[in-house]
Amino acid sequence: LYGDGNALVNLNVEQDIKKYIALSETNFSVSKDGGTVEVLVTGYGGDAKLYASPDYKSYGYLNMQWAKVTKGLLQAKLQITLDANQYSEERTAGIICYFLDDDDQLIAESDYIEVKQAGQGALTSTDMSRDGEVKKLQSHTKGNVGLPIVIMGDGFVDKQIASGYYDECMQIGLDNFFSEEPFKSLREYFDVWQVTTVSETNIMDGEHNTAINSYPTGEGTLITGDYQKVFGYGSNISELMESGLFPETTFLVMMNTDTYAGTCYFGFGNESGIVNLAVGYAPLIFSP
């Protein structure tokens, strides 16, 4: 450009490249037996790092792996693998991709990826012989008397018990319970028993019969169940009954569903007043 004095003026114009992430597809379906889907991820994040994260409910059964990642103008493939779905109902895994800079500041993020997985549907039991089986999972090593916990499941059919799935779920539920304080630091003070419950069906809707008839009501996080059946299964534990500590027992019921809900009932009492007896119902957020 020339001004009035014929002087040459230089103009430097810089344009930043927009940071973005685009996906080849955002909706997928996987069979109940599990499988892998692949998403082509393109975009630009400069020197930022690329990440992918599932929603909180998907951590237990979803694995992700990046393949063929190029820097600069990004081109990458995200492989998403789902384990077999042991629940009766369909479930949906959610994933999002994003760029973070060196200060962990969000630079860009993708649309939401949804992977729907079919459920097992209705299963029924034909062999009820293991219903009520008892085994001790842990004996206290501190304190004069162990604090009693009884863990059992609901909505598990005979095949899921025979395969070892029931035992795995009970162990995961127990480990999750003892992952929180103050129970984590006090675990050595507890005695823990497991009771096997065989349900007629895995459908937990209040209309089908399960061992404890627990089910999410659909009203917020409320779960209902037949605590008298819980106590009935607990009465199979001769050591617990002979100790006189049944009124001090915490019962944990692990439900064969990943529905987001959870309820604890407190305030049971006897002729002497309030006791420490409690029943807690919880879904299997993290299953094998």
Question: Which residues does each predicted region cover?
Answer:
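Beta-sheet-dominated interaction scaffolds and their linkers
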Residues: 18-41
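Surface-exposed binding patches on compact interaction domains or structured appendages
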Residues: 20-23, 45-79
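A short beta-strand micro-motif common to beta-rich folds, especially ectodomain repeats
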Residues: 1-4, 78, 89-101
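C-terminal edge beta-strand
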Residues: 5-16, 106-120
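Short, solvent-exposed loop/turn segments enriched in Ser/Thr/Gly
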Residues: 33-39, 76, 86-95
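Catalytic zinc-binding patch centered on the HExxH motif and its immediate surroundings
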Residues: 203-204, 234-248, 255-274
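Short pre-active-site segment immediately N-terminal to the catalytic Zn-binding motif
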Residues: 160-169, 269-287
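Propeptide-to-catalytic entry region of secreted or membrane-anchored zinc metalloproteases
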Residues: 121-246
